[in-house]
Amino acid sequence: MEAGNYLATHLHEVPLIAVFCYNPGIMTITDSDLDRPSVVGGGSVYPAVQNFLLACRNEGLGCVLTTLLCYEEPEIKKILCLPDDWYTCAHVPVGYPVKGGHGSISRNGLEKMVAYNSWID
């Protein structure tokens, strides 16, 4: 959370923010009839965002997927001249890593992240 809060308060210092947008009117939302929030609508944009993140890292750039600007969407839409039927769904601040490079990637082990045949607490 500390890193996210830092980013939120320093977002104006980032040299580039890539803004990914979608139009729900031209997307196929296949789970809208379920009794829960849609997770399919707009989800197809995230593979493109992931490719963008990987390409940035390959070029030595630092970046992170955020949705911080969704809270300011009316202002962002005005700044970017987005049509009324288009919305932002991902915001990727891009710049050179502060410490001059990427550190090692650390993740939880697969056994903590994947369940097979049943839910694991």
Question: Predicted segment positions?
Answer:
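Short hydrophobic alpha-helices that are characteristic scaffold elements of the AMP-binding
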Residues: 57-58
